[in-house]
Amino acid sequence: LLKSPASQRGRDFAIMLSCLSDLGYSVEWRVVNSAEYGFPQRRKRTYILARLTGEVWDLEERLSHGVLAEAFPIVEPDSVDWVYIPEDPYRATQEFNKGTGSKTSPFHEAGVMQDGRVATAKVVEAYTGPRMTLGNVLVDEADVPEEFFIEPEKLSQWEYLKGAKRERRVNKQTGYEYTY
């Protein structure tokens, strides 16, 4: 989300921020790998919190001590990068990070935005609680309800549908052949 599209890194997220800013919202975001906070799944998720507030934020302070920083503790970032978001979402679409030659997004794992001003930083989690593995949450097979099991006569069809495929197909309208 923070990096797309490849041709204009960060543009899609900049459009979202521009729209929220245009409506008067202030925004916090965090990219969180749940395994870094003790959960058994290694998957990154982007949390976005937008608030309609008249309160003026100290962006650097909010980055380290805002709602998301309290929910997902972090080590104080070494440095903060500043980005400016165009007020008009159309301008963000056309101009954001274009022609800079940059192969990277200006948005990092944590950030805050108010009135088009963005403070963003690379962060490290500061979680010290218990950590779980998949083994901690797996249910004993004897306790799993019957409807979660695949019937033996449907197993081969299930494996085919869920498995990798390499089939020749033809588009009926154009006659174009492709591999599916």
Annotate each language-model stretch with its function.
Residues 1-180:
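Class I S-adenosyl-L-methionine
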